[in-house]
């Protein structure tokens, strides 16, 4: 089973993901957690290339295609092999991030980038995507409290980030069977409980389908 976590930086998705992984492992599920861009050496190098502040002014299509190239490598070398071994794979970001950030905020087209990725990934889609929804103001407050250095996309302005949010919301409407919204404005404990509930329900359906 393949689960992806999406949302603006600062939404708390990574923290919730780590807790869910531990919870599922305590239930004796085999779980691997990964991230995008990244997940293996080549993709991590592409991550550094894209997100480094030296990349300011990068052409939108260059940015989008680098993300997609890293994703294709990640899918074939990490995600699919673990799925074949019976693991639950949870990825911090996947194709919807490129659709939202580059398709929506960079203006390349939400529908166009969504379909392009589906073709490149040969129709491969997550079994479940959780979209952590949070207002721009709350996301910015959380980001400003982080001690680590911000990457190039973290430092984009309000107009860009609002466009990302709108694109994610558009995807939620278009793919309601795959994408579930998590209210990330709640406390970390409430977010974890809601995330856990949605994932456990999906796992039960997945197990029934396998029988």
Swiss-Prot record:
Alphabetically ordered keywords of this record: ATP-binding, Kinase, Nucleotide biosynthesis, Nucleotide-binding, Transferase
Where does it sit, as one GO cellular component term? Answer: cytosol
Q: Where does ATP bind?
A: 7-14
Q: Which domain of life is it from?
A: Bacteria
Q: What is its EC number?
A: 2.7.4.9
GO BP term (any one) = dUDP biosynthetic process
Q: Pfam families annotated for this entry? A: Thymidylate_kin (PF02223)
Q: What class of enzyme is it?
A: transferase
Query: Which chemical reaction does it catalyze?
Result: dTMP + ATP = dTDP + ADP
What job does the chain carry out? Phosphorylation of dTMP to form dTDP in both de novo and salvage pathways of dTTP synthesis.
NCBIfam families linked: DTMP_kinase
PANTHER family tied to this protein: THYMIDYLATE KINASE, UMP-CMP KINASE 2, MITOCHONDRIAL
Q: Which family does it belong to?
A: Belongs to the thymidylate kinase family.
According to UniProt, the name of this protein is: Thymidylate kinase
Q: What organism does the UniProt record list as the source? A: Mesoplasma florum (strain ATCC 33453 / NBRC 100688 / NCTC 11704 / L1)
Q: What is the lineage of its organism?
A: Bacteria, Bacillati, Mycoplasmatota, Mollicutes, Entomoplasmatales
């Amino acid at each position: 089973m393949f689960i992806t976590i999406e949302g603006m930086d600062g939404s708390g998705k990574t923290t919730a993901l780590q807790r869910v992984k531990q919870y599922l492992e305590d239930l004796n599920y085999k779980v691997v957690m990964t991230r995008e861009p990244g997940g293996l050496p080549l993709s991590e190098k592409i991550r550094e290339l894209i997100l480094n502040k030296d990349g300011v002014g990068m052409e939108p299509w260059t940015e989008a295609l680098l993300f997609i190239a890293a994703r294709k490598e990640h899918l074939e070398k990490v995600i699919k092999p673990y799925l074949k071994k019976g693991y639950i794979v949870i990825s911090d970001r996947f194709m919807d991030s490129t659709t939202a950030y580059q398709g929506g905020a960079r203006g390349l087209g939400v529908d166009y980038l969504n379909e392009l990725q589906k073709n490149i990934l040969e129709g491969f889609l997550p079994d479940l995507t959780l979209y952590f929804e949070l207002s721009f103001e709350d996301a910015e407050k959380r980001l400003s409290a982080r001690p680590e250095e911000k990457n190039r996309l973290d430092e984009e302005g309000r107009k860009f980030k609002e466009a990302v949010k709108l694109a994610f919301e558009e995807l939620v409407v278009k793919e309601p069977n795959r994408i579930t919204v998590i209210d990330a404005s709640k406390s970390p404990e409430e977010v974890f409980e809601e995330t856990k509930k949605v994932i456990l329900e999906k796992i039960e359906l997945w197990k029934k389908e396998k029988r």
